[in-house]
Regions:
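A short helix-turn-beta junction within AAA+ P-loop NTPase domains corresponding to the substrate/partner-engaging
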Residues: 141-153
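Walker B catalytic acidic pair
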Residues: 103-105
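H-loop/switch region of ABC-family ATPase nucleotide-binding domains
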Residues: 131-133
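Conserved NTPase motor "head" modules and their coupling/switch loops across ABC/AAA+ ATPases, GTPases
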Residues: 1-99, 108, 112, 116-127, ...
C-alpha cells in the first residue's frame, strides 16, 4: 500500500500524506435515497449528478493539495505509487498477471528518486516495459531484474 511505501522513508516528501475520499453523494443519505432525490434534476440535466462515479479522492501533503504543493517529479512519483498499489489490488482480486508500461520514466526525477521508484516497480513483480533516455542511471537500477533486456535505438 502507499502507506507502507511512505513508512519506508524512501520518499520523504510524502511523510505528511493524507488521503480523503468523498463518496459522490451526501454523507447523510443512502445512495438510493440520493438517486431518488436528484432524479428530476438528473433527467433535466441529462446525466446522473450523484453516485459512485462522482467520488473524489484527494491527496494532501502538509495539509495542502498535492497538485499545488508538490513538484512535477514528486507528483509523478505519487501517481506511479498509486498505480502500483492499484495493480497489486487487481492482481489479488483477479489472480492475473499485469503488464506495466511506463514511458520516459526518468523525466523530472533526480537519480535518488528514480532509483527508489524503480525499486518499487521491481517489487511490484509485474512484467515491465520502461522507456527513457537516462541511460546509465536507469540501467544500474534495473540490473536487479532477473529477466532484463535492453534495447538501444
Amino acid at each position: 500500500s502507499i502507506e507502507e511505501i511512505v513508512k519506508s522513508g524512501k520518499f520523504s516528501f510524502l511523510d505528511n500524506l493524507n488521503v480523503t475520499f468523498s463518496k459522490g453523494w451526501e454523507r447523510s443519505k443512502k445512495l438510493q435515497e440520493s438517486f431518488r432525490d436528484s432524479l428530476d434534476k438528473d433527467r433535466a440535466l441529462g446525466y446522473t449528478s450523484k453516485g459512485p462515479h462522482r467520488m473524489d479522492i484527494t491527496f494532501q501533503v502538509n495539509n495542502k493539495k498535492a497538485s499545488s504543493n508538490l513538484s512535477r517529479g514528486q507528483l509523478k512519483i505519487l501517481i506511479l505509487l498509486i498505480f502500483l498499489t492499484n495493480i497489486k489490488l487487481i492482481k489479488q482480486i483477479t489472480q492475473r498477471e499485469t503488464l506495466l508500461m511506463i514511458d520516459d520514466l526518468g523525466s523530472e526525477l533526480d537519480v535518488k528518486n528514480l532509483r527508489s521508484l524503480i525499486e518499487q516497480i521491481i517489487l511490484s513483480e509485474n512484467q515491465i516495459v520502461l522507456t527513457g533516455i537516462e541511460g546509465e542511471e536507469m540501467h544500474q537500477s534495473i540490473k536487479k531484474l532477473t529477466n532484463f533486456t535492453q534495447i538501444n535505438l
